[in-house]
């Protein structure tokens, strides 16, 4: 019997059956607009279908040019587009899967000048102001949705998902925040929800009755003047009556200032929201957000919070998620850690999606995994992210890999990251690598510091020896008050009540998060997370915001973060997560000061110049987070001995601690060697 009986139970939809309860949620990949995008998307989706996903939803495709995500974005409004899409649907069907096209009109979020919305109100995350739709333009758009659905059916899709959540066009009609009309498309809620209902009716009429229609409904807007639970319930009933097959419950607008999918969000944090609709409708409900583990999904389904679970990024992290779970090999799942660094953060700067823990995601055709033509004896020095990625992938191809590390455990910088409140998921990546090292027969030698002579018998050596913290040239840098971030995070050096952190990059923010944490991290407690971020769990307020707002605990220490640069502290943090770290630290009372000159460190504290004024920061500790130097001492003697040496990870480029680059480097080299 399966360990996950609810997860692998089929779902009967009347005219078709889904083989299990998992939806691969919509993700824009950046492939949708590329010349070879159809081939790459076909490979991407087909691999997930092959391993058992019941129903895949594509990235959002606009029904009209006004609704694209950005200039040049993908549209499906003409038969000339069908061949592109048939390539994708054929590939999925050949693997026994089903696939639905997401119809997405981005409304006032469309990042191009010709955007439209119910009212001419600029979104806080867009520099363009939308044109207010006329009555006739609204009718045309409804027909555009229906036409897009018809074309999707002709292209071989098994259904469509009508995107009515996350603050996009349909959601904008629903909320008083963005709909200030006083005609038949605005005013009271009955008129505000008319557009959504008419879209679903038109889609059903045009696409036929034996066609899946998922409606993504915003359950929890997390913005002021959003929808109430009563309104959401009324809409859900109307959407069912209009012809939807399934309702997928969305959480949060893109402009919301509450985290909904990043690592600090507890697993399955919002399934309780979906459950509130269970008695209101008779069609299946999908719950979503931070479901990255088969047991979490099973528990949600078993207690009746939803009929299906949606997972998106977990299928970037591991295409084999479902087959591994079904074969009772969940320990081999490469878990999504919710970092967003290689997926959403790349999409928002116009790059193709990938995955920090799985660089092959969306690059399957460019990074094939082939058996090694001539297996080699390979030495890998350093069991951090880069070395682990190389060792596992090279061994999987048939190479004989020996992995050395001077420390008693694998992980390198990930052993630092996993201690940061809100980054507990990094434990999962190390669990995955430990499992795969054993599975692929890597000879792991911990507590082993090697010399160049120890490596001479190997065919090639891969140096993944990482970095050493860099100490800036400040008078008094050797004072007992001074600690490196490794002293604090790895060695647990005592830290006093008043702290200055030099450096506002990623490691500086991590150190500040660690030192400012009071009690247990809310990333492990859904109730406390909702309280901390001001989510009204009764759902009585419009938008689901608690009247008292966020309740983030104050730091037990006085902390000031400093940087030499005049730019905003944390400017280099991820676009989708940096604001969370800044907001958290500021709410805790942490100060951030740019454009600082460091004069000296002595018994009194840290002497600085800020804005031309000399100041004394009377602190107990000065924690240095000001960059790092590569550790590559073994490279020159090995090369002098005529050996082939490869540098990956921090020992190659130490400018920033970049796990995405490190794992990608290790993986690419392993697939090529």
Residue map of PLM features:
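Flanking helices and flexible, charged tails adjoining ferredoxin-like Fe-S electron-transfer domains
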Residues: 200, 364-373, 383, 396, ...
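N-terminal Rossmann-like dinucleotide/flavin-binding domain of flavoprotein oxidoreductases
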Residues: 412-458, 570-596
């Amino acid at each position: 019997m399966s360990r996950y009986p609810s997860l692998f139970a089929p779902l009967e939809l009347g005219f078709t059956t889904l083989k299990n309860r998992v939806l691969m949620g919509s993700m824009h990949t950046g492939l949708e607009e590329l010349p070879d995008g159809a081939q790459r998307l076909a490979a991407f989706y087909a691999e997930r279908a092959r391993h058992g996903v019941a129903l895949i939803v594509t990235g959002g495709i606009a029904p009209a040019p006004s609704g694209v995500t950005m200039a040049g974005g993908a549209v499906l409004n003409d038969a000339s587009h069908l061949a592109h899409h048939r390539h994708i649907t054929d590939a999925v069907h050949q693997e026994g899967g089903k696939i639905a096209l997401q119809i997405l009109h981005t409304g006032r979020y469309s990042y191009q000048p010709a955007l439209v919305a119910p009212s001419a109100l600029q979104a806080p995350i867009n520099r363009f102001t939308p044109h207010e739709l006329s009555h006739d333009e609204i009718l045309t758009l409804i027909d555009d949705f229906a036409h897009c659905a018809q074309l999707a059916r002709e292209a071989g899709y098994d259904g469509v998902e009508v995107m009515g959540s996350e603050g996009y066009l349909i959601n904008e009609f629903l909320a008083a925040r963005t709909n200030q009309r006083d005609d038949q498309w605005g005013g009271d809620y009955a008129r505000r929800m008319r557009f959504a209902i008419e879209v679903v009716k038109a889609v059903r009429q045009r696409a036929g009755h034996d066609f899946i229609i998922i409606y993504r409904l915003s359950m929890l807007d997390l913005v002021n003047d959003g929808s109430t639970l009563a309104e959401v319930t009324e809409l859900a009933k109307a959407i069912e009556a209009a012809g939807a097959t399934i309702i997928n419950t969305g959480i949060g607008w893109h402009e919301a200032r509450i985290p909904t999918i990043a690592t600090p969000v507890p697993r399955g944090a919002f399934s309780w929201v979906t459950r509130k609709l269970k008695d209101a409708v008779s069609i299946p409900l999908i719950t979503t957000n931070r479901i990255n583990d088969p047991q979490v999904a099973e528990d949600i389904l078993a207690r009746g919070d939803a009929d299906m679970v949606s997972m998106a990024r977990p299928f970037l992290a591991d295409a084999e998620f479902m087959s591994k779970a079904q074969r009772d090999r969940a320990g081999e799942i490469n878990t999504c850690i919710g970092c967003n660094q290689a997926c959403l953060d790349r999409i928002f700067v116009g790059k193709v999606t990938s995955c920090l823990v799985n660089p092959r995601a969306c690059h399957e055709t460019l990074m094939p995994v082939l058996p090694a033509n001539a297996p080699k004896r390979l030495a890998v020095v350093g069991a951090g992210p880069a070395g682990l990625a190389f060792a596992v992938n090279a061994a999987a191809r048939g190479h004989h890999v020996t992995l050395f590390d001077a420390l008693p455990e694998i992980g390198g910088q990930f052993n630092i990251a996993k201690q940061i409140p809100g980054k507990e998921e990094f434990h999962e990546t190390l669990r995955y690598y430990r499992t795969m090292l054993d599975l692929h027969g890597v000879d792991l030698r911990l507590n082993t510091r090697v010399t160049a002579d120890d490596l001479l018998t190997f065919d090639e050596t891969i140096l993944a020896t990482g970095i050493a913290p860099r100490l800036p040239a400040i008078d008094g840098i050797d004072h007992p008050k001074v600690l490196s971030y490794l002293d604090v995070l790895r060695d647990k050096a005592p830290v006093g009540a008043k702290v200055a952190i030099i450096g506002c990059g990623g490691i500086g923010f991590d150190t500040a998060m660690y030192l400012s944490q009071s009690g247990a991290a809310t990333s492990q407690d859904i109730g406390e997370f909702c309280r901390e971020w001001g989510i009204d769990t009764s759902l009585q307020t419009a938008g689901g915001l608690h009247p008292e707002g966020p309740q983030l605990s104050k730091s037990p220490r006085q902390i000031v973060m400093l940087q030499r640069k005049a730019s905003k502290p944390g400017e280099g943090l991820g676009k989708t997560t940096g604001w969370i770290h800044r907001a958290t630290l500021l709410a805790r009372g942490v100060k951030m000061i740019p454009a600082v000159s460091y004069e000296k460190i002595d018994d009194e504290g840290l002497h600085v110049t800020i804005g031309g004024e000399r100041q004394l920061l009377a602190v107990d500790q000065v924690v240095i987070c000001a960059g790092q130097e590569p550790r590559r001492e073994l490279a020159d003697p090995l090369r002098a001995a005529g050996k082939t040496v490869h540098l990956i990870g921090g020992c190659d480029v130490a400018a920033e601690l970049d796990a995405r680059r490190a794992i990608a480097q290790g993986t690419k080299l392993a697939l090529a060697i």
